[in-house]
Regions:
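Class I SAM-dependent methyltransferase Rossmann-like catalytic core
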Residues: 9-21
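Conserved alpha-helix/loop element of class I SAM-dependent methyltransferases that forms part
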Residues: 21-40, 55
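Class I SAM-dependent methyltransferase SAM/SAH-binding core
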Residues: 41-97, 121
Length: 262
């Protein structure tokens, strides 16, 4: 059996259906907990289509936000949504940020760190560009604990012998791994929190379009007609619907924050 192809986020519209609602729910909880105050300078590392940056703009009136992502398609999608003058959208690598050291008050990776091939390098870069005393923070879906929104899909694909792609650095989603990394980097005043969210789909067709057809793994295109029908049956059996046909799925993320030594 060949390994699944790496996850790539190249379709901004599909990402909006697939992950943006989840991202906004988790991001709102994360920002309430982060509580950095208004008027700060931010870097949003792995900004995707700008969903988290939009939350920052709405909640904390930042003086500036540098939002960076490796996908030109995602950044283009963000440009279509975000026109705020204090936002700078760029294409770039989380492991080699194009910013001066000690520049930002707040550095965040929102649902990104487990996609970084070398999480330590990514976190080190966030720390480097953060001002002394500034906040360095991250949250990721708890992949190892079954908390990612795609878990029902992953489980059924695994059972069919068609494993879906996983984030390359899934181990960093564990609280123990996050705390060890932040401690190893010398980040102070470290705190952690679990973020629990849910999403309700109008019916199974809504779930299928949002979480399967729109998946960045391109799952449906890799299955035969019979396999697609089997996957639908498995997911319908697994996901209970309400009397109205609505389906509610739960997910949870591991979050960490701390401050750069002054």
């Amino acid at each position: 059996m060949s390994p699944p192809e790496p996850i790539k986020f190249t379709d901004g519209a599909a990402y909006e259906r697939f992950m943006a609602p989840w991202s906004r729910s988790a991001g709102a909880l994360f920002l309430d907990w982060l509580a950095p105050g208004t008027g700060r300078s931010w870097v949003d590392v792995g900004a995707g289509n700008g969903a988290f940056t939009e939350l920052v703009l709405a909640k904390y009136a930042p003086s500036s936000v540098c939002a960076i992502d490796p996908s030109d398609a995602q950044i283009e999608a963000a440009r279509k949504k975000i026109s705020a003058k204090q936002v700078e959208l760029s294409i770039g690598d989380a492991m080699a940020l194009p910013y001066d050291s000690n520049r930002f008050d707040v550095a965040v990776m929102a649902l990104v760190l487990f996609f970084v091939p070398d999480p330590r390098k990514g976190a080190s870069e966030m720390l480097r560009v953060t001002k002394p005393g500034g906040i360095v923070a991250s949250y990721t879906w708890d992949v190892m604990g079954g908390g990612i929104p795609a878990q029902p899909l992953w489980d059924e694909m695994d059972a069919m012998g068609k494993p879906a792609a996983r984030p390359p650095s899934a181990e960093i989603s564990r609280f123990a791994a996050l705390k060890a990394l932040w401690a190893d980097l010398g980040i102070r005043d470290v705190e952690t929190r679990e973020l629990v969210v849910e999403r309700t789909f109008a019916d199974f067709d809504d779930y299928w379009l949002s979480m399967v057809v729109s998946s960045p793994s391109g799952i449906v295109g890799k299955l035969t007609g019979a396999e697609t029908a089997e996957l639908k049956r498995r997911l319908q059996d697994r996901l209970p619907a309400s009397a109205s046909g609505a389906i509610t799925v739960h997910a949870w993320a591991t979050a960490i924050k701390g401050r750069k030594a002054a």
